[in-house]
Regions:
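Core register positions within helices of long alpha-helical scaffolds
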Residues: 43, 108-111, 115, 237, ...
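Long, repeat-rich segments with strong aromatic
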Residues: 220-248, 252-255, 261-262, 336-361
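Extended, well-ordered alpha-helical scaffold segments
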Residues: 4-9, 48-61, 119-138, 237, ...
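Internal, well-ordered domain-core segments that constitute the primary functional module
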Residues: 101-167
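Extended glycan-interaction surfaces of carbohydrate-active proteins
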Residues: 1-32, 56-95, 146-225, 263-342, ...
Length: 415
């Protein structure tokens, strides 16, 4: 059966290939998404190293002059997705969105290069671009020592509980009429609500009205929430960029120093109740819910004994690790996007950190559970952690990618 799934995973990656870049899945997500693309590269590296590097090169080719790599690149027209390039109005030569997404590309590039050192020249060419992107995060998003996101989509965890407090202060009442496309592809009960979408669009309209001034968006915009997940990913990305540069024989452009600077600011997101937590940087108020971003602390070398206890409780509370919200909380919603479900690609990131922290048994639990979910339900976007029901989009690129690169090949340092 595993051999059949290997072939199916490769077919999904090649089937979602649009010529130099992949889409997350046909229909629901018809463009190039930033962190999806980085995971796609990891998957391609198990059978086509050249194509893996091309994926990352295509992504970084659409970097903005200020260093930002946007969260969506609209390579071609497709009316099946909203909000499209006209709504964003960024004015880029190839249309893009006006925000970014968690910077996992350096981490993927490092693992890809470690598996095949012959591609060092291609890695070397990416280092300055990735370093410029990381510096952009420091300049345009780091406030009070940690990453503050200006839109829930920038976190990649669109409707997580983390953003509810900040979103309550966003006025979505004047966005005008619009037609969502996502709920025509998947069950609406698995997607963000209309009220959430109204506020998402209000934030896009604010950015557009202010010329996508990235610093102004952080300093004056309607929403700024410190995100543990993106902060931990950026710390790890800076560590991995330094290692990538060393392996490729080029300067790391300050990556190691950026990582240490960020580690020094982590106290901002440590909730006194004993866990890493999102925090509204406009009000100083913690979210108060143990959510998915916290599980990436080990990825950044920021594990604490309190988090070990939370991990054990969460693993014991569901059949399939790892729920994106503490399953003991009343707010846990097993099938609604980032309010409870298990995401295979996120499990891979969590497991990478756990393995590096010496938690081999916990990392293996995530690998085995994720494999069981895929064997039982296919290559879906995410799953119900209580019973394994597949949810969201099917034939999903990053789910196929982590099957090949993590579950089957054991690629990377978490093997």
């Amino acid at each position: 059966m595993s051999a059949d799934l290997d072939a199916r995973a490769r077919a999904i990656l090649t089937g979602n290939d649009r010529g130099g870049y992949t889409v997350p899945t046909a229909g629901l997500y018809p463009f190039q998404w930033n962190w999806d693309s980085a995971f796609a590269a990891w998957g391609f590296s198990t059978f086509d190293a050249d194509r893996a590097w091309t994926e990352l090169e295509t992504l970084t080719a659409h970097q903005w002059p200020d260093g930002m790599i946007p969260h969506i690149v609209f390579h071609r027209d497709d009316e099946g997705y909203f909000p499209g390039p006209g709504v964003w109005g960024t004015g880029r030569p190839t249309p893009t969105s006006g925000i970014s997404q968690p910077p996992v590309a350096a981490t993927m590039a490092r693992m890809i290069l470690e598996a095949d050192r012959s591609k060092a020249p291609r890695a070397a060419a990416l280092v300055p671009k990735l370093a410029a992107w990381h510096r952009w995060w420091i300049r345009a998003r780091v406030r009070e020592g940690v990453v503050g996101i200006v839109h829930p989509w920038e976190s990649g965890r669109d409707n997580a509980f983390d953003w509810d407090g900040g979103m309550a202060n966003v006025d979505g009442s004047n966005v005008g009429a619009y037609q969502r496309r996502d709920t025509s592809h998947v069950d609406a009960s698995m997607r963000p609500t209309k009220a959430e979408y109204d506020r998402y669009l209000a934030q896009v309209q604010w950015g557009k009205a202010h010329g996508w001034d990235q610093v102004k968006m952080a300093d004056e915009g309607p929403f700024l929430v410190a995100d543990p997940g993106t902060t931990f990913i950026l710390i790890r990305a800076c560590d991995d960029l330094a290692a990538l540069a060393a392996a490729a024989g080029v300067a790391d452009e300050g990556a190691a120093e950026m990582a240490e600077t960020l580690r020094g600011g982590l106290g901002t997101i440590w909730n006194p109740d004993g866990y890493w937590d999102s925090r509204d940087l406009r009000t100083g108020v913690f979210t108060g819910i143990l959510s998915a971003g916290a599980w990436l602390c080990w990825l950044a070398g920021a594990g604490r004994p309190e988090m070990d206890a939370h991990l054990a409780r969460a693993l014991g509370g569901v059949r399939y690790a790892m729920p994106t919200v503490d399953p003991t909380l009343p707010a846990f919603d097993a099938r609604r996007y980032w309010r409870g479900p298990t995401w295979p690609f996120y499990n891979a990131l969590i497991a990478l950190g756990l393995r590096d922290a010496g938690k081999a048994a916990e990392a293996e639990r995530l690998r085995v559970d994720t494999a069981d979910l895929i064997r039982g339900g296919g290559f879906y976007e995410y799953f119900d952690p209580t019973d394994g029901t597949p949810c969201g989009g099917k034939d999903f690129t990053w789910t196929a990618a982590i099957w090949l690169a993590w579950i089957r090949s054991g690629a990377g340092r978490d093997a």
